[in-house]
């Protein structure tokens, strides 16, 4: 009885009994303890008998029997002898599977350094001994001696000696000292190290030194030494004296037909090691000459290197076919390695795949499954049913019946399949909606039928796509499939909370056609009593579908009690809309139906249905919409003919006008009035504008037609042109595509992104000539090449994102923080790009939201802002709200539900255990394939909008200028002299309505705080050049402007005007290199003028390419331009757009020419210059001056004597997120990354909720650098998880010690993934060798917190349905700890009282059995 209980206990303990995985160095004794015997011979198996050779690599005595429960010689067979060791062949009688787990070992005749600790940079052995890698290699590979014991000589420990030096030393000191070669020497040195003393010594050094590099070096060594001390690893274990041998079934030898064998490469590598080792043993026994032994030792070292990591040092050892052998390191790393191939993803049983076709008659929760497939997939279920029903006596009989496909089998199949959901998956599975559950409907044929509405989620179309089917087997799996993965439960997209079950294409066209109205249609003006009558009128031909009629419509409105009240009104509508109303669920307002329904409107319909009526109604409604849409699309008979593409008559006038303008510019260029760059820009602007005008004329022509109404008067109505209807409804095509069909194709781009200045004036209807076609091929082909690249890049980005965010899970309800991000609407120019409600919807308020201008609380803090509350915000015109955010969440190792807010895919506050990190990564990665790879084109047509050159106000209100400096010119207008000026217009309530960036040199007609009316133009500037504005009036004095040296003079042939162009420093003669062309302003007497209220001279340094059109001594007034600097031409400036931009942001890469930001607040001045750089000084009000060297070619935004604030831009450029974090803090960097990423996605029309990007930013910010460690466990300058610092600080606070000081650090996603606490997760991501080496040396523990680690060790993940399981394990563990403590104390007292009765025993046995069942 007792044994049985024990046996069951042993069975149930599988992967449950560990909570932490620790990795470390193996000591020789440990390796021997794993081993079941020493492998002495290189033989594998006997080629005649196929039996393993004794003591060889496949030896049965060491590794276990080849056949189950049978020894090698056949003396003992069968189960009854299990555990017996055969005296003849020495094999233990047991199962074969022990050959997968029993290890052997090889006793090495000479120690060998482990290549990972030697060559994986930084070399651990080198760091420990404080020697360069080159020197260690010289010793290891027998080129030099190293002193291990200096004795009384004047040699030093660790000194290298050549052969000659060694012999000399031996002559001088005989055996006073000891010097060795090879791994033994290194082993001796490592053995002789006193780690603690070394640590102390380094700590003292660290206190004394001041040099930064030295400090870095010492901290590196100190960290390594401390890791050794703490982990209990011994340094000499990095040199191996015993080599473990992998169990034979993990490096199999498979006989092929024809007497040959296929073998794992590892066997070759092991054979090599054993051969050399045995030869070395013999040589040592024979006392062979030193040089031979040395050579053999070196070869042994090399062969062990190859076994562990082939190709890491020297040339890789190759097999018979010139292919490098796969070593142990190669087995685990890379896509084909153990981690990614077998642990993170596996192939599964009970799956099939087939082509998909449309199932327009299916319900949303159904899919059509071919009978043949179903029969195969549900086989075991059918067998079981056949047996239990008594149709078959044995499994064999059942099998026969199924193979013969007897009639009864089909009945049973239908029964088995009923309510058994199956999973459908379409590769690539980019987000969680790529796998959904459906109920199968058996169909004839061989193709899976898919419901059209889920195509958007799968990104599927029916041009030959295939899908895979999986069968959830266990009851739990079926439950999860039905409750969580059913397509009806996934109506909303997790990326943005909008419905993803939206009709597209035909359905949209059908509904649009159905709800259009037509002037003077048949039956116009009829009075109908209800929608049924309207349908009757349409079916009998009394009225057309589009006719305007009056119908009595009954709406149902929910009252306070939640019941529906009927409300009937006579409504002006059309027949089609009335018919559509018949499928509307109760509780929807008719106003949503009484309009022309395009794709957006239909999406809104479904969204409203979901929010108002709940999931079930919404799903049924979506199905009805689809059926109706298909029916009426068929009725509409929409088709496209060539005559539908109507070319506007105005087109040719517009084009000829543009050609004249271009000719004029060309003339100006030839007469020297404009530069080549300006000409190019202007030509492109002209054509871009012409294209817009043609497009507008075409759309006006297409979109409207004039008809005669009932009164006999002409009336305009939307056109019934098929092409227009398709684009207008959102079914297919866009205005930009129609423009190419019937307008003009417009400007094209070259492959490098610059724009070709001759546009294609033809369109597809007229057809292109050869030249036009040739120009347009660039764009088209680049598009194809891009697509291929894009897919790979996008997949890689997704992989990195998932990896960095995988362990972020909702672990608690509320962390209690008051922190958050302040949200304001995003306004660019005169348009509100993103309204406030979109930004705060589904977030939790971090502080009470007050009614503007009062102290009245509108919404208390910690409230989830839903649609209704957002309406309240809009009604009270609130324009900034502080909301909780994951970036500021205080939870350690996870986030709380309140900081995350609404679960976008479900519409309520997020549940605990939801894997928000993975969802965020998928939401950002999935649209990645829709982003462009570079600059933005539409089918190659360059979209260069005419550049802005003025601000025209759209709303009446008040002007506000931010960080503006200006001078007032003699027309009393303001001329800006500051760089990053922002101009906003606010309305009467103080809400920001418009927001513009105004460049340096712009002329403003209104100042700060002045009123403007809508339509006024309040700022003007030249978009193609940047002026240098005079801030005082006076006379020009040229300094260092010397013709031929620093400037060239260009004279216009026609006008005779001459202008001076400053040369770039690189182009000047040597004499002119150090001169600085400057315009100085002096008064009438030639004295210097200072800028008003400063002691700074009024002088302006001119950069290269600047054009001066004034003469020396000319008079200038305030605000006049002194010179102009041409701006770069459009198109050639390569804006990194699309995917690479997103990747750069998440990788936190520093841009090529980053903006230079002010490190401190203070007054700017310039110090002594060096050859290529300027010295910028910032003097704060108190404290020491900060100085920075800036290259001369950088244009500065500050003048001497200006006051700057910390974080202000000193020189323009792309800002580095690291700088933003350092100077402006976490919130600013979050805002920056979120906005920049959103800009890229918005441009492509992709909607992603901000919080997904914030989740990734939180993971990028999870490390901190310790700046003041005090007496804590941390080192200064060490990189630690923020959560760990917070935990330590909480403890210190409780003890009354000062908190550890730290600075947050921003890591790119790849770096952040590799720097995660879990070494298993990091190793399965990238750079496996390096991660494992580091972890082993440090003796790291993996707490198995994240998802990846748990998948790899084969457990449920601590998220979703596995969250509770892990919580319970955690609780049990705590209870067990307490019980263990108690039992130690109480064992004595309990022993007397505790007697177990037979009943108790059987009860506990039953419990054990149940537990064992559960475990299985």
From Swiss-Prot:
Taxonomy, superkingdom: Bacteria
GO molecular function annotations of the record: DNA binding; DNA-directed RNA polymerase activity; magnesium ion binding; zinc ion binding
Cofactor annotation remark: Binds 1 Mg(2+) ion per subunit. Binds 2 Zn(2+) ions per subunit.
Gene3D superfamilies: 1.10.132.30, 1.10.150.390, 1.10.1790.20, 1.10.40.90, 2.40.40.20, 2.40.50.100, RNA polymerase II, clamp domain (4.10.860.120), RNA polymerase Rpb1, domain 3 (1.10.274.100)
Binding site for Zn(2+) 2: 815, 889, 896, 899
SMART domains assigned: RPOLA_N (SM00663)
UniProt keywords, alphabetically: DNA-directed RNA polymerase, Magnesium, Metal-binding, Nucleotidyltransferase, Transcription, Transferase, Zinc
Catalytic activity reported: RNA(n) + a ribonucleoside 5'-triphosphate = RNA(n+1) + diphosphate
CDD domains per record: RNAP_beta'_C, RNAP_beta'_N
Binding site for Mg(2+): 461, 463, 465
Top-rank EC class of the record's enzyme: transferase
Family annotation (Pfam families): RNA_pol_Rpb1_1, RNA_pol_Rpb1_2, RNA_pol_Rpb1_3, RNA_pol_Rpb1_4, RNA_pol_Rpb1_5
One GO term describing the cellular component: DNA-directed RNA polymerase complex
GO biological process: DNA-templated transcription
Necessary cofactors: Mg(2+); Zn(2+)
EC number: 2.7.7.6
Residues involved in Zn(2+) 1 binding: 71, 73, 86, 89
Subunit (UniProt): The RNAP catalytic core consists of 2 alpha, 1 beta, 1 beta' and 1 omega subunit. When a sigma factor is associated with the core the holoenzyme is formed, which can initiate transcription.
Function per UniProt: DNA-dependent RNA polymerase catalyzes the transcription of DNA into RNA using the four ribonucleoside triphosphates as substrates.
NCBIfam families per the UniProt record, alphabetical: rpoC_TIGR (TIGR02386)
Family: Belongs to the RNA polymerase beta' chain family.
Protein name: DNA-directed RNA polymerase subunit beta'
Organism: Haemophilus influenzae (strain PittEE)
């Amino acid at each position: 009885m007792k044994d049985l209980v024990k046996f069951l206990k042993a069975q149930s303990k599988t992967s449950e009994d560990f909570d932490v995985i620790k990795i470390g160095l193996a000591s020789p004794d440990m390796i021997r303890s794993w081993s079941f015997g020493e492998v002495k011979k290189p033989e594998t198996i006997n080629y005649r008998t196929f039996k393993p050779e004794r003591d060889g690599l496949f030896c049965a005595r060491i590794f276990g029997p080849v056949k189950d429960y049978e020894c090698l010689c056949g003396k003992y067979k069968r189960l009854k002898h299990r555990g017996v060791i055969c005296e003849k062949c020495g094999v233990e009688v047991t199962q074969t599977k022990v050959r997968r787990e029993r290890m052997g070992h090889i006793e090495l005749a000479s120690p060998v350094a482990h290549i990972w600790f030697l060559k994986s940079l930084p070399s651990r052995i080198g760091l420990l001994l404080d020697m360069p890698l080159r020197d260690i290699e010289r010793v290891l590979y027998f080129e030099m001696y190293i002193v291990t014991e200096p004795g009384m000589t004047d040699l030093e420990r660790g000194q290298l000696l050549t052969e000659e030096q060694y012999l000399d030393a031996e002559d001088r000191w005989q055996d006073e000292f000891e010097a060795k070669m090879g791994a033994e020497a290194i082993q001796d040195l490592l053995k002789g190290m006193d780690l603690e003393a070394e640590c102390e010594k380094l700590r003292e050094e660290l206190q004394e030194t001041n040099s930064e590099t030295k400090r870095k070096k010492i901290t590196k060594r100190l960290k390594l030494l401390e890791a050794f001390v703490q982990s209990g690893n011994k340094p000499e274990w990095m040199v191996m004296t015993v080599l473990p041998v992998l169990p034979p079934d993990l490096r199999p030898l498979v006989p092929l037909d024809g007497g040959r064998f296929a073998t794992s490469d590892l066997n070759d590598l092991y054979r090599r090691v054993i051969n050399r080792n045995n030869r070395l043993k013999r040589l040592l026994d024979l006392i062979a000459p030193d040089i031979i032994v040395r050579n053999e030792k070196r070869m042994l070292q090399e062969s062990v290197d190859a076994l562990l990591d082939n190709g890491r040092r020297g040339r890789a050892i190759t097999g018979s076919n010139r292919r490098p052998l796969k070593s142990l390191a190669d087995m685990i790393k890379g896509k084909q390695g153990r981690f990614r191939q077998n642990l993170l993803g596996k192939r599964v049983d009970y799956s099939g795949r087939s082509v998909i076709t449309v199932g327009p008659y299916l319900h949303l929760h159904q899919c059509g499954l071919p009978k043949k497939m179903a029969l195969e997939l549900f086989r075991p279920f059918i067998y079981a049913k056949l047996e239990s029903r008594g149709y078959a006596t044995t499994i064999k009989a059942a099998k026969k019946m199924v193979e013969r496909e007897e009639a009864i089998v089909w009945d049973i199949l239908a029964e088995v399949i009923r309510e058994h959901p199956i999973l459908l998956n379409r590769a690539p599975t980019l987000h969680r909606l790529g796998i959904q559950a459906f109920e199968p409907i058996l169909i004839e044929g061989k193709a899976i039928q898919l419901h059209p509405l889920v195509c958007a989620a799968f990104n599927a179309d029916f041009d030959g796509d295939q899908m895979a089917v999986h069968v959830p087997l266990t009851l739990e799996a079926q439950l999860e499939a039905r409750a969580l993965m059913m397509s009806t439960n996934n109506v909303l997209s997790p990326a943005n909370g909008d419905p993803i079950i939206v009709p597209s294409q035909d359905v949209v066209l059908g509904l649009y056609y159905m709800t259009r109205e037509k002037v003077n249609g048949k039956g116009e003006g009829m009075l109908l009593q209800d929608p049924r009558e309207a349908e009757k009128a349409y079916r009998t031909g009394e009225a057309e579908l589009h006719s305007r009629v009056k119908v009595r419509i009954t709406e149902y409105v929910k009252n306070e009690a939640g019941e529906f009240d009927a409300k009937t009104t006579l409504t002006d509508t059309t027949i089609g809309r009335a018919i559509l109303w018949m499928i509307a669920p109760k509780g929807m307002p008719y106003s949503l139906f009484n309009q022309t329904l395009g794709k957006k409107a239909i999406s809104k319909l479904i969204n409203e249905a979901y929010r108002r009526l709940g999931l079930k109604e919404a799903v049924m409604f979506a199905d009805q919409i689809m059926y109706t849409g298909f029916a009426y699309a068929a009725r509409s008979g929409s088709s496209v003919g060539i005559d539908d593409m109507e070319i506007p008559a105005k087109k040719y006038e517009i084009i000829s006008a543009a050609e004249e303008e271009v000719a004029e510019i060309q003339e100006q260029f030839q007469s020297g009035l404009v530069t080549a760059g300006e000409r190019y820009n202007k030509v492109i602007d002209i054509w871009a504008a012409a294209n817009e005008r043609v497009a507008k004329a075409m759309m006006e022509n297409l979109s409207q037609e004039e008809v005669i109404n009932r009164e006999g008067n002409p009336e305009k109505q939307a056109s019934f042109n098929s092409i227009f209807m398709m684009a207008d409804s959102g079914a297919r095509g866009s205005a930009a595509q129609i423009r190419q069909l019937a307008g003009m194709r417009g400007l094209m781009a070259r492959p490098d992104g610059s724009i070709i200045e001759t546009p294609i004036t033809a369109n597809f209807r007229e057809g292109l000539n050869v030249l036009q076609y040739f120009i347009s091929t660039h764009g088209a082909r680049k598009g194809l090449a891009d697509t291929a690249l894009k897919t790979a890049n996008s997949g890689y980005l997704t992989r990195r994102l998932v990896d960095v965010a995988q362990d972020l899970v909702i672990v608690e309800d509320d962390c209690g923080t008051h922190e958050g991000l302040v949200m304001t609407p995003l306004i660019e120019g005169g348009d509100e790009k993103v309204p406030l409600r979109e930004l705060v919807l589904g977030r939790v308020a971090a502080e009470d939201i007050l009614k503007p201008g009062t102290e009245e609380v509108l919404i208390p803090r910690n409230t989830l802002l839903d649609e209704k509350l957002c309406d309240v915000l809009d009604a009270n015109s609130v324009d900034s709200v502080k909301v909780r955010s994951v970036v500021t969440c205080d939870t350690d190792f996870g986030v709380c539900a309140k900081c995350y807010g609404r679960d976008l895919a479900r519409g309520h506050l997020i549940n605990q255990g939801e894997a928000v990190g993975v969802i965020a990564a998928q939401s950002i990665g999935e649209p990645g394939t829709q982003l462009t790879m570079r600059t933005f084109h539409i089918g190659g047509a360059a979209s260069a909008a005419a550049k802005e050159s003025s601000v025209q106000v759209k709303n009446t209100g008040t002007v506000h200028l931010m960080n503006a400096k200006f001078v007032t010119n003699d027309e009393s207008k303001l001329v800006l002299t500051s760089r990053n000026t922002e101009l906003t217009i606010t309305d009467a309530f103080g809400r920001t309505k418009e927001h513009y960036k105004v460049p340096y040199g712009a002329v403003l007609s209104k100042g700060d705080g002045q009123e403007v009316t809508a339509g006024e133009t309040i700022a003007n500037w030249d978009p193609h050049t940047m002026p240098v504005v005079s801030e005082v009036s006076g006379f020009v004095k040229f300094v260092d402007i010397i013709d031929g040296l620093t400037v060239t003079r260009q004279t216009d042939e026609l006008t005779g005007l001459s202008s001076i162009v400053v040369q770039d420093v690189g182009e000047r003669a040597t004499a002119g290199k150090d001169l600085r062309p400057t315009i100085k302003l002096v008064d009438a007497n030639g004295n210097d003028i200072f800028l008003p209220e400063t002691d700074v001279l009024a002088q302006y340094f001119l950069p290269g390419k600047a054009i001066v059109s004034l003469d020396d001594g000319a008079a200038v007034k305030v605000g006049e331009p002194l010179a102009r600097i041409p701006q770069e031409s459009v198109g050639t400036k390569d804006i990194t757009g699309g995917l690479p931009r997103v990747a750069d942001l998440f990788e936190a890469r520093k841009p090529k020419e980053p903006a230079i930001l002010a490190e401190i607040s203070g007054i700017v001045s310039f110090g002594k210059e060096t050859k290529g750089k300027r010295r910028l000084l910032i003097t704060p009000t108190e404290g020491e001056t900060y100085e920075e060297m800036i290259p001369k070619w950088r244009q500065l935004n500050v003048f001497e004597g200006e006051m700057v604030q910390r974080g202000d831009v000193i020189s323009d450029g792309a800002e580095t997120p690291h700088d933003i974090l350092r100077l402006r803090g976490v919130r600013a960097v979050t805002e920056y990354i979120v906005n920049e990423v959103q800009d890229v996605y918005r441009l492509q029309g992709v909607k992603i909720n901000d919080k997904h990007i914030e989740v990734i930013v939180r993971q990028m910010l999870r490390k901190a650098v310790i700046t003041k460690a005090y007496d804590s466990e941390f080192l200064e300058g060490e990189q630690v998880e923020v959560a760990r610092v917070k935990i330590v600080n909480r403890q210190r606070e409780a003890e009354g010690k000062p908190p550890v000081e730290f600075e947050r650090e921003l890591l790119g996603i790849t770096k952040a993934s590799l720097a995660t606490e879990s070494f298993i997760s990091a190793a399965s991501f990238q750079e496996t060798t390096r991660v494992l080496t580091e972890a082993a040396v440090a003796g790291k523990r993996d707490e198995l917190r994240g998802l990846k680690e748990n998948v790899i060790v084969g457990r449920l993940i601590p998220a979703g349905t596995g969250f509770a399981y892990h919580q319970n394990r955690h609780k049990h563990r705590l209870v067990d700890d307490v019980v263990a403590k108690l039992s130690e104390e109480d064992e004595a007292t309990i022993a007397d009282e505790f007697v177990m009765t037979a009943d108790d025993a059987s009860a506990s046995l039953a419990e054990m059995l149940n537990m064992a069942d559960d475990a299985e």
